[in-house]
């Protein structure tokens, strides 16, 4: 273990700053200021990231294209709106350790969880339960409970909670729950990072345990994407969803992201909600009555992205 000698003086702090390879990125963001004009020390990126200085430039470019092209901006804009969501694909794939055709930019986090649970929470009389952690982000809990009710079950019976001990979630406890009730669990929905404690969960192990019990598994990566290294394709959850306004600095309500493992890309529109953006790109604007399914994660889109 390396020794770390901490000193409580300005010179030492400045020395650490000078050795920070990422320090130059600070100048690319806008910081709120105190009344005295000094910029604040911002430690709220886990809630809302700072605004990048280039945001206004990018917004104005889109507004200019809209004014110049009108509807033709779908194909003629500097960043054509028809394929706008694809610009995020390579970045999302790199950030999440996914294949590019497994990720999609769409909607916002909880909307995406509902869209994905439409596919991956398919309860029956035997296997109808959802497992979450007891200290889950409230929106995840509300989404899970509403899905349970929507399918005619009672959350008091169908929602299983993985309890922490001394503010830590232990994988052995999860394993015991799965061993006892695995054949009744339709979906395991857990975060990559527990939002309150900061605990990084062993996602690969959780996915393996879920699959061995025949359970679908989804990950909420709101506090993980852009924060820790991820390998979704290798770990093989059925799905994952995340927001972009925390560590990705996308701004309040910015478009979310979703991952659907390529093993599910052949469902051809039979297990998800559909809309015209789920339709194959080549036939989308032909306005035909026959649905032609997109062949990858695009199938889970419903509407065009919020440019």
What are these model-derived regions, one by one?
Residues 1-307:
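Pyridoxal 5′-phosphate
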């Amino acid at each position: 273990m390396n020794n770390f000698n901490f000193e409580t003086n300005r010179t030492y702090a400045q020395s650490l700053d000078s050795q920070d390879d990422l320090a130059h990125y600070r100048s690319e963001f806008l910081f709120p200021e105190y009344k005295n004009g000094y910029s604040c020390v911002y430690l709220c990126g886990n809630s809302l990231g700072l605004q990048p200085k280039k945001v206004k430039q990018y917004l104005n470019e889109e507004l200019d294209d809209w004014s110049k092209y009108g509807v033709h901006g779908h194909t003629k804009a500097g960043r054509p709106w028809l394929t706008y969501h694809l610009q995020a694909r390579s970045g999302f794939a790199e950030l999440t350790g996914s294949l590019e055709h497994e990720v999609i930019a769409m909607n916002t986090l909880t909307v995406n969880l509902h869209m994905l649970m439409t596919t991956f929470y398919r309860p029956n009389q035997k296997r109808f339960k959802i497992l979450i952690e007891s200290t889950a982000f409230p929106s995840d809990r509300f989404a899970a409970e509403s899905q349970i009710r929507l399918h005619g079950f009672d959350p008091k019976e169908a929602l299983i909670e993985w309890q922490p001990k001394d503010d830590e979630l232990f994988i052995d406890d999860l394993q015991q729950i799965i061993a006892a009730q695995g054949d009744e669990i339709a979906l395991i929905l857990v975060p990559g990072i527990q939002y309150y404690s900061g605990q990084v969960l062993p996602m690969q192990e959780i996915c393996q345990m879920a699959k061995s019990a025949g359970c679908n598994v989804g990950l909420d990566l709101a506090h993980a994407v852009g924060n820790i290294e991820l390998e979704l394709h290798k770990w093989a959850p059925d799905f994952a969803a995340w927001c972009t306004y925390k560590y990705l600095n996308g701004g309040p309500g910015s478009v979310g992201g979703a991952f659907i493992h390529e093993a599910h890309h052949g469902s051809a529109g039979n297990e998800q909600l559909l809309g015209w953006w789920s339709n194959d790109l080549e036939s989308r604007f032909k306005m035909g009555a026959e649905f032609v399914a997109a062949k990858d994660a695009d199938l889970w889109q419903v509407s065009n992205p919020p440019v």
